[in-house]
């Protein structure tokens, strides 16, 4: 099966609504217009995980949350409409190496490692709506050169080197791959897990206030 359309007339799909398309390696396109499981707002854990040929997905308007690992290792997925999505789970798009752009305009929460290894991403815009991001959201996004945060965002901002900081500037969350040379961590600041992973930074100066 390379393509499937689930119409709005369908009232039940599987017994649990979990992992229905897990590891369907030949599936290229899916259009879902029917409720998923018993929850109309949630795309379950690992729903499309391992669908290595999947290029396009059309989700029902009711879906506002993408479960953990929902699209993990969908290596052919180039883009997905996230309009209306408010929460992205842990590792949701991990290993989606063809995913070239993401629209986070309606997203409030992004889980741990959500876009880990999305090597086709070159730039990401974080809008006002995003107020809660987990650990190492963009870990191993080796080609992510530009990260921009809306001036109106109340939770995050950029530092002078283009790094992602919490709003009060006390924690370094992510340093883009384009960063090179020496980086000085200011007094009173901390660094999140893997904050400098994959960068060209050759030296990090750690202040006395920081424990390693």
Question: Where would I find each of the regions flagged by the language model?
Answer:
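Structural signature of tandem-repeat unit edges
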Residues: 1-12, 24-42, 52-65, 75-87, ...
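Consensus positions within tandem repeat domains that build extended binding/scaffold surfaces
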Residues: 17-22, 44-49, 67-72, 89-94, ...
């Amino acid at each position: 099966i390379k393509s499937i359309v689930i119409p709005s007339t369908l009232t039940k799909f599987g017994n649990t609504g979990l992992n229905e398309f897990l590891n369907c390696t030949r599936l290229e396109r899916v259009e879902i217009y029917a409720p998923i499981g018993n929850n109309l707002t949630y795309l379950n854990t690992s729903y499309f995980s391992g669908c290595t040929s999947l290029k396009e997905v059309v989700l029902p308007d009711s879906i506002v949350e993408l479960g953990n690992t929902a699209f993990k290792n969908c290596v052919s997925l180039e883009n997905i409409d996230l309009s209306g999505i408010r929460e992205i789970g842990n590792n949701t798009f991990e290993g989606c190496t063809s995913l070239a752009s993401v629209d986070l305009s309606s997203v409030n929460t992004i889980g741990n490692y959500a876009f880990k290894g999305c090597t086709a991403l070159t730039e990401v815009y974080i809008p006002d709506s995003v107020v809660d991001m987990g650990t190492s959201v963009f870990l191993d996004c080796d080609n992510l050169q530009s990260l921009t945060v809306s001036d109106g965002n109340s939770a995050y901002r950029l530092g002078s080197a283009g790094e992602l900081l919490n709003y009060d500037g006390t924690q370094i969350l992510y340093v883009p791959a384009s960063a090179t040379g020496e980086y000085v961590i200011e007094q009173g600041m901390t660094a999140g897990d893997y904050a400098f992973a994959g960068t060209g930074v050759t030296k990090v100066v750690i202040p006395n206030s920081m424990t390693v």
